[in-house]
Amino acid sequence: MTRREPVQKRSRERVQAILGAARELLAQGGVEALTTRRLASFSGIPVATIYRYFEDRDAIIAAYLDEELASIDRAVEEALLGLDRVTFRSMSAAVAMAHLRHHQAHPEGIPVWFGTRLSTAVHDSVRELDARMAASLHAATRGAGFIEEGPHFGAGLIVRLWDRTFEHIFRIERSAAEQAAIVLDVIDMIASYMERFATPAGIEGISSAEFLKVLRRPAAR
């Protein structure tokens, strides 16, 4: 899936208008409601213009997911900044609760993140974002010195576990308190296991400012 990256201000505004309309259509009718024809009608942007920026519907959904992840990343940083000290456990809680609150506030994205009746291209986009999150988690925990020698599985499995957890949470109607209780239980399960491999820094923590420096550090190539 490819899309034309906008350069001019007007083009960027059009792309944002397209993605805003896509968000509204997802909220109104789910993934099935998101077609280029409906998108054009809802946004007032001609179909031909939409195709100038997005190859197809899957490319629109991929761009929507990119914006979702960027929003979640900002929420995670804000949550981490609110901590006096960041430990492996408090980091896990901040990240997981930021994801939960985002999905609670933006339920239109849940079928896209956790749905099964999606195209291969969209599933590939979700897997790519999962891989990015796993790489960020791995780099942050290692860079902060929280874990030196971990279990045989990697951060990717933890991210996949959270995917299945959120899929379970939103599969049926639950109150916000019930959703949070499930997340807190899974946080405790993961943190309790990973603390077997934690260093003193992973248990006692480092300052949030110090941790965010590590989190924002460019990934090694």
Task: List the model feature ranges, each with a label.
Residues 1-13, 198-221:
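N-terminal intrinsically disordered/low-complexity leader segments
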Residues 1-29, 36-38, 42, 59:
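Basic, helix-initiating cap at the start of DNA-binding domains
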Residues 26, 61-68, 75-76, 110, ...:
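Alpha-helical DNA-contacting segments of helix-turn-helix folds
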Residues 36, 47-49, 61, 65-69, ...:
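Membrane-embedded alpha-helical bundles of multi-pass transporters/translocases
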Residues 44-54:
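Short hydrophobic/aromatic patch on the recognition helix
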Residues 63, 77-104, 158, 183:
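Hydrophobic alpha-helical connector segments
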Residues 89-94, 104-135, 176:
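Short secondary-structure transition hinges
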Residues 111, 115, 123, 143-189, ...:
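Hydrophobic/aromatic-rich alpha-helical bundle segments in the mid-to-C-terminal region
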